[in-house]
Regions:
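Cytosolic catalytic headpieces and adjacent flexible linkers of membrane translocases
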Residues: 1-167, 171, 185, 199-200, ...
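Membrane-interface helix termini and inter-helical loops of multi-pass transporters
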Residues: 335-337, 367-369, 398-406
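Alpha-helical transmembrane segments
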Residues: 354-358, 390, 423-432
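Membrane-interface capping segments at transmembrane-helix boundaries
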Residues: 429-442
Length: 459
């Protein structure tokens, strides 16, 4: 612009006035407003034949237009939840640096205490403009992304958004990208998870994305992460419970070979446990509500197996071994008094031990009593079904004949509470020792707190 529009006689735009207008625009941008400068050109006959440079010359400045597009009220809490969950949020926008920084402070991505409010200078450490990014080599960009958090990239082109996604992925990070415009499509396609806006998003963005948000709400992504983590945790509970009985089921055959004694269980009795008494309880564990503190845990490593070492050790050496010791101990002590009844007691003790394992498996870290009041109808129905199914197999003569079982003498029933008590005691000691070890490792600096282990999500 060379002049300021003022009726029929435009005023010349000098350097001092230009600086004053720029300061006003910066102050508006510092409030998180998107600022547009409006100008006109007079006497533009034959404009169709002019190029862009000619059209954008000799303009008269009309005024500044500020647009407000405030973030949703839920976004600051969602950003804080991401930080607790170890998810690194990076803002990538086409807005100016001052506007982007102001919005980043409003949503809690940048700390408002790091810069005085209304300061018309974008933080060069946290806010990177497109021109600055273009001057960075790939190595420098990866170093920036690796060692800097809570970054804001302003005035980004589609190519630069794509470059950021590729750089994050080259660091081994799992990258999620949100976008709504055509210029976001390359980054959405290149990300591990592309998330398009369902209400305001373009057809191109929705086609390029993997997920479409129907409510255009960033907080919905955090809820999805929480439910996803809950599903993974429930799979771990399910697997731990299901394989816990394997040790107690294998122990009779090991003892049969080693001690030359009759097997404590028949094949049908093992199937009765695996396909009968364990089925509904396992489904109940799959429906467990999310555990408190789930979003304060670090993200899972990419490619980490669901059936990992901690699950196997806990299932076999803690829960399963406890069941095996009690069930085989009772069988060896009572074998001489009645073979089929001793076998029935072994079966009943494994079922009782699985009831204790069911209570223990509701959490991988909390003592079982801290989850007793958590509502889950399917879980409690499964817990009640175990002794009921076992009693039907033992007390109904046709079923007892098929499964080679007999009713137990009343004095032998005193063995049954020992199995769940042993399992719960062993699991409580195991969880306590793990908590003590982790606290010791964290205090000594050998293990970083979960909040410092970050996975990246690009926005």
């Amino acid at each position: 612009c060379s002049h300021i529009a003022a009726g029929e006689h435009p005023i010349s735009l000098d350097a001092q006035t230009r600086d004053s207008l720029q300061s006003q625009a910066d102050r508006l941008a510092c409030r998180g407003l998107r600022v547009l400068a409006v100008a006109v050109r007079r006497h533009c006959d034959g404009w169709q034949s002019l190029d862009n440079g000619q059209l954008e010359s000799a303009l008269e400045f009309v005024g500044l237009l500020a647009l407000m597009d405030p973030p949703r009220a839920e976004v600051p809490a969602a950003i804080a939840a991401c930080r607790e969950a170890g998810i690194k949020v990076t803002m990538v926008t086409g807005d100016s640096g001052l506007t982007a920084e102001a919005i980043a402070r409003q949503i809690g991505l940048l700390d408002p205490r790091e810069s005085p409010p209304g300061n018309p200078v974008a933080d060069p450490v946290r806010v990177i403009h497109g021109d600055d990014l273009a001057r960075l080599s790939d190595v420098q960009l990866r170093q920036l992304l690796r060692f800097r958090s809570r970054l804001v990239f302003a005035r980004m082109t589609p190519e630069q958004k794509l470059r950021l996604v590729q750089s994050y992925r080259s660091l081994g990070e799992v990258v999620g990208v949100t976008g709504d415009g055509v210029n976001d499509a390359p980054a959405l396609r290149a990300a591990d998870v592309g998330i398009a806006m369902g209400c305001s998003g373009t057809d191109v963005a929705r086609e390029a994305a993997d997920i479409v948000l129907l409510d255009d709400n960033f907080a919905t992504i955090v809820d999805a992460v929480r439910h996803g983590r809950a599903v993974v945790a429930n799979i771990g509970r399910f697997l731990t419970y299901v394989i816990a009985s394997n040790v107690a089921e294998m122990a009779p055959f090991v003892a049969m070979v080693a001690l030359q004694i009759p097997a404590a269980l028949t094949v049908l009795q093992i199937l009765a446990v695996d396909l009968g008494t364990d089925l509904l309880p396992a489904l109940g564990l799959g429906a467990e509500p999310p555990e408190p503190g789930l979003m304060r845990q670090p993200p899972r490593r990419r490619g980490a197996p669901l059936l990992n070492r901690s699950v196997l050790l806990r299932a076999y050496l803690v829960l399963g071994l406890s069941e095996a010791v009690v069930s085989m101990g009772a069988y060896l002590l009572l074998l001489d008094r009645g073979g089929r009844q001793a076998s029935t007691l072994t079966f009943a003790l494994i079922v009782a031990g699985q009831m204790g394992a069911l209570l223990a498996c509701r959490s991988a870290s909390l003592p079982f009593w801290q989850r007793l009041r958590v509502p889950n109808r399917l879980f409690w129905l499964g817990l009640l079904s175990e002794p009921l199914i076992a009693a039907l197999l033992v007390l109904i003569p046709p079923l007892a004949a098929v499964f080679s079982m007999e009713p137990l003498p009343r004095p032998w029933l005193g063995w049954l509470p020992l199995a769940p008590l042993a399992v719960l005691l062993a699991d409580t000691l195991h969880k306590g020792s793990l908590r003590w070890w982790r606290q010791r490792q964290t205090a000594s600096g050998m293990v970083s707190p979960p909040s410092s282990r970050l996975s990246r999500a690009n926005r």
